[in-house]
Amino acid sequence: DAYSIACKEGADMLAFPEMFLTGYQTQDLVQKSAFVEDAQSKLIEFAKECSDGPTIGIGVPLQDGDKVYNAYAILQNGKIITQIRKHHLPNYKVFDEKRVFDSGEIHGPYVVNGVRIGSPICEDAWFPDVCETLEETGAEILISPNGSPYYRGKFDKRISLMVSRAVENNLPMAYLNLVGGQDDQVFDGGSFVINSDGALALQMPLFEENIETITFKRTQDGWVAQEGKKASYPDHWEQDYHVMVLALRDYMKKTGFKKALLGMSGGIDSALVAAIACDALGSENVRLVMLPSKYTSQNSLDDAANCANLLKAKIQTIPISDSFNSVLKTLEPIFEGLDEDTTEENIQSRLRGLLLMGLSNKFNEMLLTTGNKSEVSVGYSTIYGDMAGGFNPIKDLYKVRVFETSRWRNNNYFSWMKGSRGEVIPNEIIQKPPTAELRNDQKDSDSLPDYEILDGILEMLMDNDASVADCVVAGYELSDVKHVEKLLYLSEYKRFQSAPGTRLSLKAFWLDRRYPIANKWRDNK
């Protein structure tokens, strides 16, 4: 473990990231005194167990009277010598720290073997004042513990900000980040060390738990980090896919599930989720289920079977036609004289949800949902039907990116993937027009603009908070924009009841975007 390695290496200090002892984010759990007291009790035990080794820095919640702090505890000789309290509390996007924590005063440096160390906690290093104060009070090295979750492009922003802090204060900095999934968020690791001139001395890999030793040498110009390992930096396609795999793997582990199942439609969304599930859990732990109706084409049946074969995952078929007819017969006296509409379509979807949840309960397998961000945005899904499930790996992936990600996966394989090499999503699935197959000759484009147009409008309206007028200026038809806007707002109630899913962007559904369910405002300018 990390402590044993640090002792073996003769390290002066073993540094862990922010809130490492409890995980991050703990949300309102830190408002429970029993939780914080338990964390502090474990911290005391940990300090005693590690009394003969190096100084340890570790993130932990701290209660002081009626105040609760996001703290960084420094352990030496079996004792807690200080607990640094986070000063800047983020209160935007997924962060609600002002709701659950109190702001601490800026803390001065602590001493490790005669060297003065300053530890700005995460957000404290995003602004100049804390690091500046640490430098002015004698800090010689900065060690910044972080719980920084992934979004596309986040790593580049971290590097840029930390280079600024190092150069501004003429101090080397070690940036430590958590690794792993917590609900919808993934902490992507990628810890690094930079010198006072902004040069990178060490880069740890993204998405992997790792332990590295870094040596600092004193020079006439101050301490300098010696050159260490520099992990390669994956492109954004690999990062996104790895995040979806890690999010599912950790969510399953932390909620006690070892196996997953999902409904296969023969379409691209379920095929991609199946690939992610196999890469996260291994194909032997994934059950695929085809639930055909009279509207399901033979091509869909063949494509689903072919995909399962490429993934080396078992697939089972449960026809729903008899169940569907039985429900219609039961409702016939009440529906008499009424035309068929989306009611009958939704009954099919809910029957599938019913059967899949039955399998989930019986075999203790987590049911995965497969709605992409485009569908989740406009409510192109059936509540208590295909929305039924425990986790959605592609919830923050627009449809156009679903196609691109599927092509990427077919052409790429890495050691962290537990699934099959090579093509895992048949080209026939990627090429065919999307359809829900809930009525004859149905296509998604019957109800929605083409996905290139839909995704473009959604990115403006939702991701960038653009106005309807902005969308029209960008070249989109007013009728399309108003239609998408209407669906976006009307679908809020569905999203409140949807499964959690991997956060990939700066505007994912849940904590990044909080809208009322009942509100009639529309952008009519």
Residue ranges and their predicted role:
Residues 1-263, 274-285, 290, 315:
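Enzyme catalytic cores with a strong preference for nitrogen-chemistry domains
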Residues 170, 196, 223-266, 270-525:
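ATP/NTP-dependent adenylation/nucleotidyl-transfer catalytic domains that generate, transfer
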